[in-house]
Amino acid sequence: MKLSKIIFIIAIFIFTANSVQAKKITPKRETVEWIDVWLPHTNDDKLPRVLLIGNSITRGYYPKVEKLLKGKAYVARLTTSKSLGDPALIQEINLIMSYGKFDLVHFNNGLHGWEYTEDEYDAAFPDMIKAIRKNAPNAKLIWATTTPIRTGKYCERLKERVARIVTRNE
């Protein structure tokens, strides 16, 4: 009797361990992963705070946004190669947003994570919104959709990705 109880307990433990492992998300990463963070005026609360979350495109237009909002808002950035679907993106958002209150959050995430399907991307989108809302419940949110590539010498070669971008933006 005791032996059968022990076997039963071991079987439940093994089943539970396998079940938990099956639900573990394996990130689909690029060959090189990167993160770039800029948090200016962290000890100053005279102006509203804006956070730009995105990739290298966001990092590219950050200086212009910062210049346009000079004297009106402090502009911070979290730019990363992480994509929706990668739990590390949510961790990065939580970390950066823990540094202070943000009044507006502008986010654009879509040109990385090609290994994630559109269904995986769609399923992960609410998690990003929840993370932003958890850290900045009263912030205004701006979602910048990913711009499809429609012209240029690479257009034909990128046709499949452009179709995926359009689907992700819907």
Over which residues does each language-model region extend?
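Alpha-helical cap/lid subdomain in secreted, periplasmic
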Residues: 1-3, 68, 88-170
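N-terminal secretory targeting modules
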Residues: 1-52, 58-74, 94, 98-100, ...
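Second-shell loop/turn segments in exported
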Residues: 48-52, 78-82, 112-118, 156
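A mature extracytoplasmic/lumenal domain signature
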Residues: 56-57, 69, 79, 145-147
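Short, glycine/acidic-enriched loop or turn micro-motifs at the edges of active sites
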Residues: 57-58, 111
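Flexible, glycine-rich phosphate/dinucleotide-binding loops
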Residues: 59, 84, 150
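A short beta-strand-loop structural module common to alpha/beta enzyme folds
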Residues: 72-88
